[in-house]
Amino acid sequence: MVKNTEDKPLAQNKKARHDYEIYETFEAGIVLTGTEIKSVRQAKIQLKDGFARVRNGEVWLSNVHIAPFEQGNIFNVEELRTRKLLLNKKEIAKIDKELSGTGITFIPLKVYLKNGFAKVLMGLARGKKDYDKRETLKRKEQNRDIARQIKAYNR
C-alpha cells in the first residue's frame, strides 16, 4: 500500500518568511531528471538561496541545490543547475510584470509531492528591513506570551 504523501513538504525555505514579505504565492511544476526526482523524494534539496527569473516567456529556477542520487552514477547532473518551472501563460505574464518593479523577487518557499509530481510553492516577495524583522519577532513573542498566560489562567 502506498503512503499518502499528499502535500507533505519535502523542503521548506523557513528563512524566506523571515527575510521577505510574501504577498502572492504560485504553485509550479518543476522539470527534473530521473535521478533528481529520486533525490527530491529523499528530501535532499535545499531552497535557501534559490530564486527564479522569467526569460523568453519561461520561468527558470536558479541556485536550488539538489544532492546527487547515491546510486545514480553517470546519470547524475550538476547540483545547482537551472531548472524550468511549469506555469500558465497568464501566471508567467503576471509574474514578469511584477518582477519588473523594483525590490521584488520570486523565491521558492516549499517543495512537495502532489499526485506523484514534484511541485514548488513560489512566492512574489519584497525584502524586509531590519526594523521590520525585529518588529515581527517582537509581535510573535508577545502573541506567545499571551497564549501562555491564557493557558495558565485556564488551568
Swiss-Prot record:
<comment type="function">
    <text>Required for rescue of stalled ribosomes mediated by trans-translation. Binds to transfer-messenger RNA (tmRNA), required for stable association of tmRNA with ribosomes. tmRNA and SmpB together mimic tRNA shape, replacing the anticodon stem-loop with SmpB. tmRNA is encoded by the ssrA gene; the 2 termini fold to resemble tRNA(Ala) and it encodes a 'tag peptide', a short internal open reading frame. During trans-translation Ala-aminoacylated tmRNA acts like a tRNA, entering the A-site of stalled ribosomes, displacing the stalled mRNA.</text>
</comment>
<keyword id="KW-0963">Cytoplasm</keyword>
<dbReference type="InterPro" id="IPR000037">
    <property type="entry name" value="SsrA-bd_prot"/>
</dbReference>
<dbReference type="GO" id="GO:0070929">
    <property type="term" value="P:trans-translation"/>
</dbReference>
<dbReference type="Pfam" id="PF01668">
    <property type="entry name" value="SmpB"/>
</dbReference>
<protein>
    <recommendedName>
        <fullName>SsrA-binding protein</fullName>
    </recommendedName>
</protein>
<dbReference type="GO" id="GO:0003723">
    <property type="term" value="F:RNA binding"/>
</dbReference>
<dbReference type="GO" id="GO:0005829">
    <property type="term" value="C:cytosol"/>
</dbReference>
<dbReference type="InterPro" id="IPR020081">
    <property type="entry name" value="SsrA-bd_prot_CS"/>
</dbReference>
<comment type="similarity">
    <text>Belongs to the SmpB family.</text>
</comment>
<keyword id="KW-0694">RNA-binding</keyword>
<dbReference type="InterPro" id="IPR023620">
    <property type="entry name" value="SmpB"/>
</dbReference>
